[in-house]
A protein has these predicted regions:
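Transmembrane helix-loop-helix hairpins at the membrane interface
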Residues: 19-26, 35-39, 48-163
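Interfacial transmembrane-helix boundary/kink motif in multi-pass membrane proteins
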Residues: 1-24, 43, 80-83
Length: 163
């Protein structure tokens, strides 16, 4: 039986991972950009309702929806079919391709390096980390909590970028 991870400790670990991925993105692209989901969000002109929707999307809707699909349904199927490592990699690749298709138009015009990093590599790393959380804890709920941390970080980063 695997040891359980207290959720506050898991959240703390996820802050470290998201910081490392974000700093790698800055090193690779030379650009400090908001997360793709918030790329077109205008912080200065946003209404209270737009803020509620943005925060709700980043810390509830997206983490729950994506984790239920990618880690709750697809990951067990991929792991059963491809083995432990193959399932992790295939799940992360599917997650990355989903994000690439969904957000390419928003970030592609900025810089080709940004498109490759923020559109494919960073989502792959995020997906790999989230799949590892799911595999280690055997809990989709833990993956949702980890994803919530990514969403909270995205909101904080948006504030940092826009001052």
């Amino acid at each position: 039986e695997l040891p359980t991870i207290p959720l506050p400790f898991l959240m703390f670990i996820m802050i470290g991972f998201v910081l490392v991925i974000d700093l790698l993105g800055l090193a690779v692209t030379g650009l400090f950009l908001p997360f793709m989901e918030l790329f077109t969000f205008n912080i200065t002109n946003a209404t209270a309702l737009e803020w509620i929707f943005a925060v709700g999307f980043m810390v509830f809707t997206q983490p729950v929806g994506e984790e239920m699909i990618f880690r709750g349904v697809l990951f067990p199927l991929m792991r059963a079919r491809l083995g432990a490592v193959g399932g992790l990699v295939a799940n992360a690749a599917a997650y990355a391709l989903f994000h690439l298709v969904l957000y390419t138009s928003q970030i592609g015009a900025v810089d080709p390096r940004a498109l490759i990093w923020y559109g494919l590599i960073a989502p792959f790393l995020d997906g790999l980390i989230l799949a590892c959380v799911r595999a280690y804890t055997q809990s989709t709920s833990a993956a949702i909590v980890a994803h919530v941390v990514f969403g909270l970080f995205a909101i904080v980063k948006l504030f940092v970028i826009t001052g």
